[in-house]
């Protein structure tokens, strides 16, 4: 494959040399290879974007490009935006892999900025509407065959693993290292075991990238005493450490957690983010902890990183203007009978489960309107009671309208401005389960018996019967 020679933008301060915990024969053989080719580099940008490239060349591959703007109804913004020159460089990538549909990974404004030049690769999930969407809009797109190595350059291959939760992982084999991009997939133990078995057979240093901060409604609960936090920052650090040690990772790159929350109704969540300082404070893994926004030489494992004082956040005046405009639009919106009926249909897909979980029912506070859901009757209707049901989900009206009409109601729990007021003592994890159930319907797994069986079958196959080959030599 021929790549263009370019200047790599975005030099970062600080440099250090790292050593894998073990002496790998594969690394010793690399010196001869490097004499013939420029060094292979790994760089993290944006939120969950990695770029794999050779020095002086355009990327062989990038992933999950959220590079401009915001996501989740103007709530999430990047800590550090790439420069226009860096985005131009990324737009020349040969391939773009999208792990899953969440907008902080499948971000259409960023993809439009990158253009139709790259080939867009997607996991072979049970439902693949995103693939048809890309093709329909003039992009080159295809699904990557699961659990099969695919060459993308000289001595560089990728392997995609689809998961039951409509997410995927991407493994990248290079001459001197194995890159394990778990993003925020949270693979179950059997999948981690299969990856570990394959990685042991390959025998190269391992670089793990995965999220380390909450991206759900886990801290969105309120009772009469204030915020009910289900998991502290240390929980997320301990999880990453366990994954690192389970996979015998040599290095960990903080990843897929580089967002801040800027709406006036979501900024509270910044106090519950897991930060890089938390990672350093609680780190107990044998893997080497690297900073966010790092460029890593895959031959000798030297690296440099962008210091926090050099981050490029969005201009403050622009954030204030855009979030203010969104909040004004929320307040001006009105729910229609069609919107209410659509939400009722969505809930009734799980009517009997919800009756078991919440026999007293629950409610939605949508601006000035409160709608109570009675699972036994399967009805969502106006409620004048302030204490009816187990909990109240507080959601801005326009956001609810858009979530129902776009069939992505489960994403409300990720927004950080949706709050859940507990009206009585019960396990808040049941509400978390509600959003997980809604995702099953959002992604089309209940459209037909065939769709449900396809999803369940693939989930079983790629969890309990997963067999990963080593890359061809």
Please provide the spans of the model-predicted regions:
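Feature captures hydrophobic
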Residues: 297-473
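Zn-dependent metallo-beta-lactamase
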Residues: 1-82
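Cap/insert and terminal regions of metallo-dependent hydrolase folds
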Residues: 190-285
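Catalytic core of the metallo-beta-lactamase
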Residues: 45-57, 145-146, 150-203
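Active-site neighborhood of phospho(di)ester-bond hydrolases with catalytic His/Asp-centered motifs
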Residues: 62-64, 92-106, 121-125, 180-185, ...
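Pre-active-site segment of Zn-dependent metallo-hydrolases
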Residues: 33, 55-101, 108-113, 187-204, ...
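Active-site-proximal loop/helix segment associated with metal-binding centers of metalloenzymes
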Residues: 65-66, 75, 161-176, 185, ...
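Metallo-beta-lactamase
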Residues: 8-10, 14-37, 117-177, 281
């Amino acid at each position: 494959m021929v790549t263009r020679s370019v200047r790599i933008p975005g030099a970062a301060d600080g440099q250090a040399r790292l050593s894998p915990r073990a002496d790998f024969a594969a690394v010793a053989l690399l010196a001869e290879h490097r004499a013939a080719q420029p060094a292979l580099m790994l760089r993290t940008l944006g939120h969950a974007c990695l770029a794999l490239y050779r020095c002086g060349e355009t990327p062989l591959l990038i992933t999950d490009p959220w590079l401009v703007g915001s996501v989740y109804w103007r709530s999430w913004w990047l800590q550090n935006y790439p420069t226009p020159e860096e985005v131009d460089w990324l737009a020349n990538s040969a391939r773009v892999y999208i792990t899953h549909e969440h907008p902080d990974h499948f971000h259409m404004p960023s993809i439009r900025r990158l253009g139709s030049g790259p080939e867009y690769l997607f996991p072979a999930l049970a439902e693949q509407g995103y693939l048809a969407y890309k093709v329909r809009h003039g992009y080159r797109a295809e699904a990557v065959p699961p659990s099969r190595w695919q060459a993308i350059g000289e001595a560089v291959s990728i392997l995609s693993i689809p998961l039951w939760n409509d997410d995927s992982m991407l493994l990248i084999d290079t001459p001197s290292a194995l890159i394990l991009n778990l993003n925020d997939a949270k693979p179950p133990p059997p999948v981690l075991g299969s990856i570990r078995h394959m990685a042991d057979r390959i025998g190269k240093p391992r670089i793990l990238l995965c999220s380390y901060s909450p991206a759900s409604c886990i801290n969105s609960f309120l009772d009469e005493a204030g915020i009910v936090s289900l998991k502290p920052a240390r929980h997320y650090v301990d999880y990453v450490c366990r994954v690192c040690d389970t996979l015998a990772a040599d290095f960990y790159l903080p990843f897929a957690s580089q967002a801040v929350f800027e709406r006036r109704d979501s900024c509270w969540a910044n106090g519950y983010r897991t930060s890089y300082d938390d990672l350093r404070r609680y780190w107990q893994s044998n893997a080497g902890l690297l900073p966010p926004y790092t460029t890593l030489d895959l031959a000798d494992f030297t690296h440099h990183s962008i210091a926090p004082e050099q981050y490029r956040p969005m201009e403050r005046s622009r954030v204030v203007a855009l979030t203010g405009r969104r909040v004004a639009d929320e307040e001006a919106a009105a729910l229609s009978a069609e919107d209410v009926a659509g939400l009722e249909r969505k809930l009734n897909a799980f009517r009997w489960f919800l009756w078991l979980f919440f026999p007293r029912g629950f409610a939605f506070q949508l601006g000035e309107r409160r709608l109570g859901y009675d699972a036994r009757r399967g009805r969502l209707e106006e409620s004048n009671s302030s204490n009816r049901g187990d909990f109240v989900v507080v959601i801005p009206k326009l956001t609810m309208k858009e979530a129902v009409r776009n069939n992505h109601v489960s994403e409300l729990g990720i927004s950080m401005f949706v709050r859940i007021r507990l009206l009585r003592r019960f396990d808040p994890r049941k509400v978390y389960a509600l959003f997980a159930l809604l995702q099953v319907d959002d992604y089309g797994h209940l459209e037909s018996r065939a769709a449900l069986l396809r999803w369940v079958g693939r989930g079983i196959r790629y969890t309990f019967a997963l067999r990963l080959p080593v890359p061809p030599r």
